[in-house]
Amino acid sequence: MKAMRESPRRLLAPFALLAALSACVRYHPRPLSPRRSAAAFQTRRLDDAKLRVFLSDYGRAPKHWPKRHWNLGDLILVALYESPELAVQRARWQVARAHVITAGERPNPRVGFLSQHHSMAPEGVLPWTLGFSFDIPIETAGKRGDRIQKAEALADAARFQVGETAWQVRVRVRQRFLDLWATTEQARLLKTQAQLRERLLKLVEQRFAAGENSAFAFNSIRLGWRRTQMTLSATEAHVARARAALAQSLGLPLGAIAGLHFDFTNMNHPFAGQYPPLTTLERVALRHRLDLQAALARYSAAEDALKLEIAKQYPDVHLGPGYEWEEGDNRWSLGFSISLPLLNQNQGPIAEAKARVVAAAATFTALQARVIGQVSQATTGYRGALKTLQVTGGLFEAQRKSQRLFEQRFATGKIGLVTLLKERLAFFAAARDRLIALQQAQQALGALEEALQYPFAKSFSLMPAMRHPSPSSLRHTHS
């Protein structure tokens, strides 16, 4: 009888051991509050101490904090620190990295418990048959390794996508910064032109009242003054919109950049060094373009998926050891089972995987062709923009010399004030033409850098975006 009492306890021991060894991850709720996240966004500032640490980590340690002047390189790092789009891509990268862990997990064994009651058991004999059995799966044909390789390739693609998003953040910041600089300069020139036209209009109006000028000349100058005023008003509105667009590209509220001073020095000097051959630029693009690297990683993942489907043709083995106790008799068993590939040999999934490999290869080839075309078009556009800038620069210098000559003639009394004012207006018109050409050259440079995904100024690095997220570089907007 003592043996009968102890045997069921021995049967229950493995289950107690399994329960003790099982480790559980507890769920910690992190509710997302739209109101709090919106309020947190409105509190973002450029004097954030964590932002200062972030800038220092990448070689832009400010001597004075908060900074008094912000240049393009500083603002790009601000955008990499604050960008919501980049935070989304980082989170997706973390999901892909977690999937590598999932892919590497081995299937857990299963345990089953058996109990049978005997209604005809002799007196004094425990009327139960007790036992348990295991199902131990064993993967074959390297399926686990194929899963891991596929997951790692997709994680690489997600990592490259983080860099691609970082580059797009850089492109948007540069475009908005350039737009703000150009519209601010346009407004400054237009304001001076408006003052000159107003002064000229008063002089011509006096002459018209005295009968010294025709009505046509007076109306023509008045119309020019009105058009300048309208253009100035529209440009000033554009300046306000450009500041708002820059704040958005930085991932900041508009109030965070109110009253900020920007350093536009580099905008006046587009890169005009010696260009390498077009084939060299194409090689640079094919080497640096992160979307190409991501497409290549996705192709590798498609190949690994095909290897996995081919490996699934070979069935996994399931070992089934078991134990039963009945009336003092200990019975052990050992069995195994496999799936018989009689009705199908996984042909459908293999065919789908093969088609995905072909599609991934076609996608990569098409992207390569598009990149080469973009580089060719952007290179031609930038060289043309530099030639236009050279021509307008020459005309501007000629107009500058002409104005100096007119200033000298006016000082000696050879010409009147009306003639001098018209010459000054011509000079500022040439200055506006040069500004437009300079803006177009900077836009063309931006298009070339975007096609190459390589900054000519070497003032930007993708490393902040490619690193693993850290507490100092990420914001938590949910509580």
Task: Say what each PLM segment does.
Residues 2-78, 236-284, 447-479:
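Terminal intrinsically disordered/low-complexity segments used for targeting and assembly
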Residues 3, 25, 144, 153, ...:
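Periplasmic alpha-helical coiled-coil/stalk elements that build and connect Gram-negative outer-membrane
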Residues 58-69, 112-143, 147, 257, ...:
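Small/polar, glycine/serine/threonine/aspartate-rich low-complexity segments that form flexible
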Residues 81-87, 94-109, 121-124, 132-150, ...:
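A glycine-/polar-enriched beta->alpha junction
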Residues 208-212, 410-414, 451-455:
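A short glycine-centered flexible hinge/capping loop motif at secondary-structure junctions
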Residues 214, 371, 378, 413-416:
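Alpha-helical heptad-repeat coiled-coil segments that mediate oligomerization/polymerization in large
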Residues 235, 290, 437:
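Metallo-beta-lactamase
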Residues 349-352, 362-388, 395:
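C-terminal structural cap/anchor segments
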